[in-house]
């Protein structure tokens, strides 16, 4: 299957993505939006994630004659020259860039519209983009929070008993950021999450309410959620579907956050799969997407 690196103009330099083409030029096009932090277009991260879910997904879609473009966010990886300081990026900037990709792809190819597939935090970006883009076929929300990200972050921190000594400080920081206030003093263990340089971005994304955004989406929506996701839960999928009753909801058993099948309830095996690039995507992931994109 053919792969091609694409570039479009960014604010200061190019934004970059990878096109994987199906056989038919007029086949549907899916734009894959990465999740939080330093997640690249393959779905990998220097923080230990090597499962490559986006690359595997692109290959599986192409095998079913669906084109895809998976992108690097501005300031990171192939899009690092798009902005001098990636810490100055706000959530709305990512949505603007996705809108620019949609316009480029819709003008470039034979598709009248583009599907957005957002994974995790990328689902929030997809929802934000859908508020203003008029050239979307629909949304595919994969492991997407159904509540503001501050609530998700609280739950993630509280679920790990090792974090208990840090929780008073962490909860105070989250509350301040929710109110639009920065926090100058952050203890060393919490620096990776809350260092002052990223607080502006966190303030911007904590203001995003996915339930309110999805209510404004007129086109088709697929909500795809695994039961063994350690970061986003089936309750999030239910919250999104309640706000968008005509959405298609697929809950996949034993599927985790990086879209791999894992033994039910086995946290260690679940976490190990994050580094297993040769582990295929879980059965049902691609099938659910194809059923919506190519009904």
Predicted regions and their residues:
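Primarily recognizes the serine-hydrolase "nucleophile elbow" in alpha/beta-hydrolase
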Residues: 104-159
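Short beta-strand/loop motif that positions the catalytic acidic residue
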Residues: 217, 223-225
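Catalytic active-site module of serine/aspartate enzymes centered on a nucleophile-bearing elbow/loop
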Residues: 255-259, 263-295
């Amino acid at each position: 299957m053919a792969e091609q690196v694409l570039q479009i103009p960014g604010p200061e330099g190019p934004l970059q993505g990878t096109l994987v083409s199906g056989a038919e030029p007029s086949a549907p096009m899916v734009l894959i939006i990465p999740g939080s932090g330093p997640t690249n277009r393959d779905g990998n991260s220097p923080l230990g994630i090597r499962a490559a879910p986006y690359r595997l997904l692109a290959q599986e879609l192409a095998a079913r004659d669906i084109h895809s473009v998976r992108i690097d966010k501005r300031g990171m990886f192939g899009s690092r020259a798009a902005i001098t300081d990636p810490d100055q990026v706000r959530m709305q900037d990512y949505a603007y860039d996705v809108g620019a990709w949609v316009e480029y792809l819709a003008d470039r190819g034979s598709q009248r519209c583009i599907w957005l597939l957002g994974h995790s935090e990328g689902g929030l970006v997809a929802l934000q983009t859908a508020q203003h883009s008029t050239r979307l076929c629909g949304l595919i929300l994969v492991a997407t929070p159904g509540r503001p990200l501050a609530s998700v972050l609280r739950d993630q921190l509280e679920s790990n008993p090792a974090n208990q000594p840090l929780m008073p400080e962490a909860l105070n920081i989250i509350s301040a950021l929710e109110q639009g206030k920065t926090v100058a003093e952050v203890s060393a263990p919490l620096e990776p999450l809350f260092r002052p340089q990223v607080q502006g971005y966190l303030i911007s994304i904590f203001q995003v309410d996915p339930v309110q955004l999805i209510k404004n989406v007129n086109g088709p929506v697929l909500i795809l959620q695994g039961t063994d996701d350690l970061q986003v839960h089936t309750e999030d999928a239910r919250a999104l579907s309640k706000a968008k009753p005509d959405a298609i909801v697929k809950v996949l058993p034993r599927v985790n956050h990086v879209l791999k099948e894992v033994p039910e309830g086995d946290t260690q095996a679940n976490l190990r799969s994050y580094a297993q690039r040769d582990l295929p995507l879980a059965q049902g992931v691609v099938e659910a997407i194809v059923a919506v994109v190519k009904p």
